[in-house]
Amino acid sequence: MLSFLRLSQLGRIGVQQRFKPLIHRTLSTSCRRFSVDIAYDEIPVSRIRNFSIIAHVDHGKSTLADRLLELTGTIKKNATNKQVLDSLQVEKERGITVKAQTASLLYRYEGSDYLLNLIDTPGHVDFANEVSRSLAACDGVILLVDANEGVQAQTVANYHLARGKELVIVPVLNKIDLKNARPDAVTQELFTLFGIDPDGVLRISAKQGTGCEQVLVEIVKRLPAPDVRRGEQFRALIFDSWFDRYRGALNLVYVKDGEVRVGQEIVSCHTGKVYEVKSLAMLRPDEQKIERLVAGQVGLLGCNMRTSKESNIGDTLYLKKNKNCEPLPGFKPQQPMVFAGVYPADQSQHPYLKGAIEKLVLNDSAVTVVPDSSPALGQGWRLGFLGLLHLDVFSQRLQQEYDAEPILTAPSVTYKIKLKGIKMIAAHGGKDTIFVSNPALFPDPNSVEEYYEPYVLGTIIAPTECTGPIIGLCVERRAVQKTSINIDNDRIMTTYLMPLNEIVLDFHDQLKSISSGYASFDYEDHGYVASALVRMDVLLNGTLVDELCTVVHISKAQSHARELVLKLKELIPRQMVQIAIQATVGGKVVARETLKAYRKDVTAKLYGGDVTRRMKLLKQQAEGKKKMRAIANINVPRDTFINVLKR
């Protein structure tokens, strides 16, 4: 009879909307597990905790999230529970978190029910935008550190990011079950670098489940409840969104004030557009439909946004009936640091690729898109990314999720240029400073007062014995050492000021190679620094090829030019005319290679020793070649451009 009554109540919720939504979950304590029905929206704010797990790549964030989901009964304990929150194929293949996910956990502690909203975060530096976005909805974080590897470069970055947002930090050492684990030494590292009290550091094994229950207890005890007001007018912050082909843009929101119900009309502060709330859901981690969201909670809101441009990360939503709503403080989105051209392999695929990019950009708002065109590659786009891994993952998602096979050009960075001359400044709308990411658009050097390139402050943590080779690599990349700290007897942390252009291609690979994989690297934006830059042009028989223009530091112009002309000589097919491949800087040729023409033996038909006839034929051939060089078009196949430009 009791079960029938419950089913009857649940059946009437959608019609009458007057019964509290009931969530049937198996909860846990350290002693026992039991089942209980909870009206989640009746949980007071004082028993809500919003938190993230932040850590270096592969320190066990997703594994710990799996254990917390199991311990709270959100998912059944199963051997197949691996990276439950990592839903993207690229995440499972690479073993990294790319897209922040959310799960609402119900936990019983000392006889009271708590709602814990776990917002998973990526660990790689390229996805710091996802981390920042996640922390906007949090009141505390778990700082997870591998007890074997110790503090890494991104651990340092994530710690300072959380401290900058004044979040409560719970330090946790993971992988204490490993044979080479050194929890005491790593605890001392946390004290040395961050001043963290060793007595407050938890020790767990997320893989084995050891100590994970204590993590839940400390979340309840140490983290503060969210600072929200349920009696005020509804306001919610959009901190993530993704696209559903049937429901349009779905928004992950953090309700700061009041409450919202299905059927109510809401307004976007950013666009001013009005929407009807079509669906509300909690993520556990799969969608579980509900009828209302209240202050302090995190949930999924669908309101029939049909285009990706309508959903803006950091936007505030409020009820239409509430006039003059004050927008919530959003968070500062990161600016792209690496740019690459993206073109369809076949121009007939342009509309399809355009739609795929638009949908992915909704799901990854850190990517910037600007239409671009190339005589060699056709119509395409110039995309901005946070880093090389970000670019790789975006390209892989295009292929896996949309069956698109785009051509990606080699990555570049954005330069700042200070102009001189009244006419040049007037031509740029009266601005004496411009930003250029495409080398082909660089202004004439005579109109430039100074060039600036983006610099980053890089942090390298590596074994002490690798210090020499690492310093050599950094000096080669024009880096300047700023600080050096001995973490312990075996590892050292150094910081360098280095040009972004020198690390976007293969710096990380080289660093891993010379340190046998033990070094970790992280960087943060340091702004623009004046630099001696030059634009390098490529000429084929005196004709400028815009697609092959590059920007290099003057100290590396000669070596880069030599590499480029040799590569072109190998890739351009031989033709009926000789081709002079030249790399020039400021009109001066700095490197040249010559591609010989096909040779036709015009004397093959001769016989005997008629030397005058032989000389006549050779003279006619020479005149014909001279004429052909003057009028012939050099045919450079599209594949050649692709092989030179692609990564």
Swiss-Prot record:
HAMAP family on file: LepA
Magnesium listed as a keyword: no
Protein name as catalogued: Translation factor GUF1 homolog, mitochondrial
Keyword entries, A-Z: GTP-binding, Hydrolase, Membrane, Mitochondrion, Mitochondrion inner membrane, Nucleotide-binding, Protein biosynthesis, Transit peptide
GO terms under cellular component: mitochondrial inner membrane; mitochondrial matrix
Function: Promotes mitochondrial protein synthesis. May act as a fidelity factor of the translation reaction, by catalyzing a one-codon backward translocation of tRNAs on improperly translocated ribosomes. Binds to mitochondrial ribosomes in a GTP-dependent manner.
Keyword Lipid metabolism in annotation: no
EC number: 3.6.5.-
MF terms in GO: GTP binding; GTPase activity; mitochondrial ribosome binding
Transit peptide, UniProt annotation: 1-34
GO BP annotation list: positive regulation of translation; translation
